[in-house]
A protein has these predicted regions:
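Residues within the helices of the helix-turn-helix
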Residues: 71-75
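Single, function-defining residue in the core of a domain
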Residues: 1-70, 80-95, 102-110, 114, ...
Length: 458
C-alpha cells in the first residue's frame, strides 16, 4: 500500500489536473450511486448483466475523446462490460429520458456543494436569488445508419434538450431531453415548471416568453428575466421612462400587465433597451419582462442581467471544442441524448476543477488565462497511464468523502498546478481571404515551387 501511495503522490505532483479529474469522477459517478439512480428512474429497462454505471464508463471514453467510437470503447472495456457489443448497443439505444435527465441532476447536486466548499463559486448575479439560465440545444444531425434512414436524403435529427445552468456554480444542474428534433421547446415547459423553486430567478430568451411559462414561474412564487416575444399578449402599457444606459444602449422601463392562465391580471416590469447597434436579425430595440422588484435590481441591472444569458452559449461552445457529446453514429434518439448528457456531466467535472483553480490562484487569473482545451488535453494525455499505474482501491475513498473533505483534497492538488502550462493562446484578428483566382485552369499546384518563387524557400 505504501508503494501505491507513493505512485499516487507522484502523479498528484506531476499531473495534478489528471488526479483531480479522476477524483471528481469517483466522487460524482460512483458505481453504486449510478446503479441506484437507474433503478429509481428506469421504467422499461432492467439491469441484467450490463450495469448502468458501466454504460456511463463506456460512453465517457467516447465523449471525452479517449476512444474514437463506442465499438472501440467496448473493445477496451470488454471484460468489465461482461456482455456482447450487440447487447451494449441495444441498451444504449433504449436508455430512457428519465434516466438521462436523472444522471445530469444527480451529478449537479453532488458537485454543487463541492464548488461551495472549495470557495470557487462566482458572486450571485442578484443577491438573495438563485439564478438559473435555461436554453435549448438541438443535437447535430446523425449518419443514416438506421434502416428507416438509409433512403432518406434529409438530415436526421436525433433530438434536443433544454439545459439549465447555475451561473454561480457554473454547473449544468438540469436537463430536459426530447427525442423529437422537430418538437417546439414549449412542449417541455410543463416539465421545467415542475422544477421551479421559490426564489429562483430564471433567465431565458424570447422562445420562453409564453403566458403559461411566465405565470407559472410567478405562481411558485419565483422570478424571471425573459426577453419579450413579439406575439406575447400584453394587456396594458404604463408610461415609458428613461433609466440611463447599459453596455448595449439606452435603457427605459414601464409597467405592463397580462392575463395569466386563470384569467388573473398579472403586473410586471418591461425593460426596453434601444440598442446602439442592431442585432443580427435587424432589431433596434429589445424588451425584457421581469417581476424582480426594482429595489433588488433596477432597470439597468435587469438589462445587464439578460446579457448573462450568453453564459450558457459559452458552455455549449466548450462542449463543442473539448468533448464529443454529439456522436454522428448514434442514430437512436435515446443513445444520442444519453451521449449529450455524458458531455454535460464531463463539463461539470471540469467546472469543479476550474472552481478549485479559481479558489487557489484567483478568479481573474484563471478565467482570463486558463484554456479549457489544454485542461481537457492534459487529462486525456495522462489518464490512461495513470489508470494502469494506480490500482482501483486507491480511488475508492473519494466516493464517500463529504463535500468539505473533497474540497480540501482538490485545493491540495491544485497547489501543484503550473498554470503557465494551460495558458490560453489568443489569436489575432482574422485576415480576410483574398479571391482565389490564380492557377484556376490547373487541378493542383506544387506548394514548394510557389514558396521558391516567393523567396520563402531556399
Amino acid at each position: 500500500m505504501m508503494i501505491l501511495n507513493a505512485v499516487f503522490e507522484r502523479f498528484a505532483k506531476r499531473t495534478p489536473i489528471t488526479v483531480m479529474t479522476r477524483a471528481l469522477l469517483e466522487h460524482a459517478l460512483g458505481a453504486e450511486a449510478l446503479n441506484s439512480l437507474f433503478q429509481q428512474h428506469a421504467q422499461q429497462q432492467y439491469t441484467n448483466k450490463l450495469l448502468f454505471s458501466t454504460m456511463v464508463d463506456v460512453m465517457a471514453l467516447v465523449v471525452c475523446r479517449m476512444q474514437p467510437s463506442v465499438n472501440a470503447a467496448y473493445t477496451q472495456m470488454k471484460k468489465e462490460v461482461g456482455a456482447t457489443v450487440s447487447a451494449l448497443y441495444a441498451k444504449l439505444d433504449g436508455i430512457e429520458d428519465d434516466v438521462t435527465a436523472g444522471l445530469v441532476r444527480h451529478v449537479g447536486s453532488r458537485l454543487g456543494p463541492v464548488v461551495e466548499a472549495v470557495g470557487g463559486q462566482l458572486p450571485p448575479l442578484v443577491p438573495g436569488y438563485r439564478t438559473k439560465i435555461i436554453d435549448g440545444k438541438h443535437l447535430n444531425a446523425t449518419e443514416h445508419r438506421l434502416a428507416v434512414l438509409r433512403d432518406v436524403k434529409a438530415a436526421p435529427l436525433p433530438g434536443q434538450a433544454l439545459v439549465v445552468l447555475d451561473p454561480s456554480l457554473m454547473l449544468a444542474i438540469d436537463m430536459f431531453p426530447c427525442q423529437d428534433g422537430h418538437a417546439q421547446e414549449r412542449s417541455l415547459f410543463t416539465q421545467v415548471l415542475g422544477s421551479v423553486e421559490t426564489n429562483d430567478l430564471w433567465i431565458a430568451d424570447r422562445n420562453f416568453c409564453t403566458v403559461s411559462f411566465l405565470s407559472g414561474i410567478a405562481d411558485r412564487p419565483a422570478f424571471f428575466c425573459i426577453r419579450q416575444h413579439a406575439n406575447f399578449p400584453v394587456a396594458s402599457f404604463g408610461e415609458l421612462r428613461s433609466h440611463g444606459r447599459c453596455r448595449t444602449g439606452e435603457v427605459f422601463e414601464q409597467e405592463v400587465t397580462f392575463l395569466g392562465e386563470l384569467g388573473t391580471l398579472i403586473t410586471m416590469r418591461r425593460i426596453v433597451v434601444r440598442l446602439d447597434r442592431p442585432t443580427k436579425n435587424g432589431d433596434t430595440e429589445i424588451g425584457i419582462f421581469t417581476n424582480v422588484p426594482a429595489q433588488d435590481a433596477d432597470a439597468v441591472r435587469i438589462a445587464e442581467l439578460y446579457l448573462e444569458r450568453w453564459t450558457i452559449e459559452g458552455v455549449f461552445q466548450v462542449l463543442t471544442e473539448t468533448l464529443d457529446g454529439e456522436q454522428p453514429s448514434l442514430g437512436y434518439p435515446n443513445a444520442a441524448l444519453f451521449g449529450f448528457a455524458i458531455a454535460l456531466v464531463s463539463y461539470n467535472v471540469a467546472a469543479v476543477l476550474r472552481a478549485a483553480l479559481r479558489a487557489t490562484f484567483g478568479h481573474d487569473r484563471v478565467e482570463k488565462e486558463v484554456s479549457w482545451y489544454y485542461i481537457a488535453n492534459e487529462s486525456r494525455f495522462n489518464y490512461g497511464g495513470m489508470d494502469v499505474a494506480i490500482d482501483e482501491e486507491v480511488w475508492n475513498p473519494f466516493r464517500t468523502m463529504s463535500a468539505v473533505e473533497m474540497a480540501e483534497k482538490l485545493k491540495q492538488y491544485a497547489a501543484n498546478v503550473d498554470l503557465s502550462s494551460f495558458k490560453r493562446r489568443r489569436r489575432g484578428p482574422k485576415i480576410p481571404q483574398p479571391p482565389r483566382t490564380k492557377y484556376a485552369d490547373q487541378p493542383h499546384v506544387s506548394t514548394a515551387r510557389l514558396l521558391l518563387l516567393a523567396g520563402r524557400l531556399t
